[in-house]
């Protein structure tokens, strides 16, 4: 009897169980599947002042700017801060969405900061797995970077 009890005790001790623990962090965002969602992501990163998100939404046909080694991390952050200043906005409205050379899209966007509205073009390109904002006209939105918008 004693051997049976020890055998059952050993068997119970060797039993394994699996417990599924849900992850507590956010699930990764899905990459934008088109030019407009990529523009929305870029402008949301600008508005949120999110350097990491901006580096993922800004790129070219080879991929995100943050993932290539053409510029240093320090230079990337300086450029992102400039973009955040120039394209600072409270709201935006997308006008034209036109196919241009090289498979790119040109979107005309009106950015509003306070009572000031400026319109510029954003150029978007399809990368290996998603779309990116490649460049945008900064001259037209220069005054959005001012400390205060005019009343």
Question: Which residues are covered by each model-predicted region?
Answer:
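Short solvent-exposed beta->alpha transition segments
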Residues: 29, 36-40, 51-102
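Short, low-complexity N-terminal intrinsically disordered segments enriched in polar/charged residues
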Residues: 15-48
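Exposed beta-sheet edge and beta->alpha loop/turn motif
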Residues: 84-151
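Sec-dependent signal peptide recognition
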Residues: 2-7
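C-terminal motif of bacterial Sec signal peptides marking the signal peptidase cleavage site
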Residues: 11-13
């Amino acid at each position: 009897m004693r051997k049976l009890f020890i055998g059952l005790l050993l068997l119970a001790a060797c039993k394994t169980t699996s417990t599924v623990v849900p992850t507590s962090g956010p699930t990764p965002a899905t990459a934008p599947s088109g030019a407009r969602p990529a523009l929305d992501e870029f402008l949301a990163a600008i508005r949120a002042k999110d350097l990491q998100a901006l580096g993922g939404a800004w790129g070219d046909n080879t991929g995100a700017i943050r993932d290539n080694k053409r510029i240093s991390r320090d230079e990337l952050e300086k450029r992102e801060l400039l973009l955040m200043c120039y394209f600072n906005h409270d709201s935006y409205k997308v006008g034209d969405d036109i196919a241009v050379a090289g498979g790119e899209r040109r979107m005309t966007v009106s950015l509003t900061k306070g009572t000031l509205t400026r319109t510029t073009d954003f150029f978007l390109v399809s990368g290996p797995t998603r779309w990116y904002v490649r460049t945008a006209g900064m001259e037209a939105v220069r005054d959005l970077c001012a400390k205060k918008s005019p009343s």
